[in-house]
């Protein structure tokens, strides 16, 4: 068994080989033994594993609540029958699958992230195996009494097709263009050769890398994920893609990397110092780029990174300017294809659109242009009708 197991692991050798040849995005930079082990061991994500019993309880509740629906309820019932059948017919397989199921669930519930479903795949696979055994038990029982092969075949077909009818509506993404549209609209909000800082990873940053590197859309824009800046490999990635950004702030980058080395290598470090160096580095990126290119942030970037600068709403982003004057801006035509389904990601994208119009409305309201402000607040409600902020501002205008 050791030889097939080793052959299976050999697929990981692709990572250091490819990383050594300057790929389009060298995620984790697994070109050395240390970084290779960090990469396959998920070192970057360990801060979210075994973080708290409260998080584990929430994830366990989510798993238990969602499991029956994953198998259209009937699948779980048949799976329990199959589990009982395994106990009688194959005790070793029963124990093996129970251990796989429990260890998968125990490990996964201790990972405090939103997109947890894929980490339960092994547990789902065990339920599928139990369901298959359950079908065998049920059909064997029916066949021994009825001997109606056509009925048995019809039963199998119905059970197999049931999840398709139950899940199709909530799994169909064929008309979901929310991320694509939001990414293109964000690009449309930025002037040529722009630099933008954001950590809206799920909503447009990750998609922007695909559109830039694969499709060649807006390669002039430097998109920087603020949270990935906490990783040394990402700073090397930026040095490869945007050498001017790192070179102009070399002193601040090196000061941060000295502290980051301690954190990444589990050495004693001062949280206040590493955070101060982190803020100083990003502030340097921003201030040293203002004279040569338009610089933007998205709304979630904290004010400590942009001290002394005005945030001017421009499309879906905020342009940073070193003055307090009013700068009239235009909202680019936004392509928005609605998607009826609700969910964490879908609802947040609608809110991000609304928030952009609210910020625009507030900017114009404070400049004394109530008409433009009202238009912006009403537009915000078109994207997120339940959002209280534009409603409150509209009441303030008409007070």
Regions found by a protein language model. Give the residues of each.
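Transmembrane-helix signature of polytopic, lipid-linked glycan biosynthesis machinery
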Residues: 36, 84-86, 98-118, 165-170
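Signature aromatic-anchored transmembrane alpha helix within multi-pass, membrane-resident enzymes
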Residues: 87-91, 133-165
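Hydrophobic/aromatic-rich transmembrane helices and adjacent perimembrane loops
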Residues: 95-98, 106-140
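C-terminal luminal/periplasmic domains and tails of membrane-associated envelope-modifying transferases
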Residues: 184-195, 209, 215-399
